[in-house]
A protein has these predicted regions:
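A SIS-like phosphosugar-recognition module
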Residues: 1-122
Length: 122
């Protein structure tokens, strides 16, 4: 549902010409296909024994981390504790929440400077 809402918002509210929006749509579709190609990797995560999930993201990925956190909380009816934070903010206290039953997922950026923080944390 998040992807559909995001694509709809981009198509409706972005004043860019339709041809440019169409190209962007193709890029997003291609990225979505790559995610689906990783289904086996995702299944490995689901099979882990966890009761906490922490999503980390910076810049535009901060909102994505928040949305992902809400989805897990909603889909598990609160049975899985969730949190979201930026990678830099996570270092200052929240990382103490990690235990053996915690999965931490980082939405890494491609910005060289910020990516250093993402990789260092991982």
């Amino acid at each position: 549902s998040f992807t559909s809402m995001m694509l709809t918002a981009l198509l409706v509210f972005d004043p860019t010409e339709f041809a440019v929006k169409s190209e962007r749509f193709e890029v997003v579709s291609s990225l979505a296909r790559k995610v689906l190609d990783k289904a086996e990797d995702v299944k490995e995560l689901v099979d882990l024994d966890f009761n906490r999930v922490i999503y980390l993201g910076a810049g535009p990925f901060f909102g994505l981390a928040h949305e992902a956190q809400l989805k897990i909380l909603e889909l598990t009816a609160g049975q899985v504790a969730t949190m979201y934070e930026s990678p830099v903010g996570f270092r200052h206290g929240p990382k103490s929440l990690i235990n053996d039953n915690t999965v931490v997922l980082v939405f890494g950026t491609t910005t060289d400077y910020t990516r250093k923080y993402d990789l260092d944390l991982v």
